[in-house]
């Protein structure tokens, strides 16, 4: 797990798991630590929907959601020729979809 968290590709982009941790580390005061741990575990099991349900908790705050999307977009587009970027693009697509759903039903 430690290798997965700290690994970078040839272009120096972090692994999706590390990006996930860095995304929510800025808002850990808002989220219980166990939620962060569950998110990391979910990603380790390669279960993106479980991660997204956790990210949606953070996305309920619009400014935080926009920041999250921007960070995922940056990591996803930094190097489009590797598997990490493909995973990031998929998560970004789901985040955008979740953002639309949240906007439709909660605002």
Curated annotation (Swiss-Prot):
Its main location: membrane. Keywords: Membrane, Transmembrane, Transmembrane helix. It is a multi-pass membrane protein. It comes from the Eukaryota. It is found in: Membrane. One of its GO terms (cellular component) is membrane. The chain crosses the membrane at residues 20-40, 49-69, 86-106. Partially overlaps YDL010W. This is Putative uncharacterized protein YDL011C. It comes from Saccharomyces cerevisiae (strain ATCC 204508 / S288c) (Baker's yeast).
């Amino acid at each position: 797990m430690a290798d997965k968290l700290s690994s970078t590709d040839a272009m120096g982009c972090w692994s999706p798991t590390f990006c996930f941790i860095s995304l929510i580390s800025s808002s850990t005061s808002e989220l219980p630590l166990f939620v962060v741990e569950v998110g990391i575990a979910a990603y380790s099991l390669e279960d993106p929907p479980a991660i997204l349900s956790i990210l949606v908790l953070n996305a309920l705050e619009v400014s935080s959601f926009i920041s999250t999307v921007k960070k995922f977009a940056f990591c996803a587009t930094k190097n489009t020729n590797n598997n990490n970027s493909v995973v990031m693009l998929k998560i970004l697509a789901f985040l955008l979809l979740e953002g639309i759903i949240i906007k439709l039903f909660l605002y």
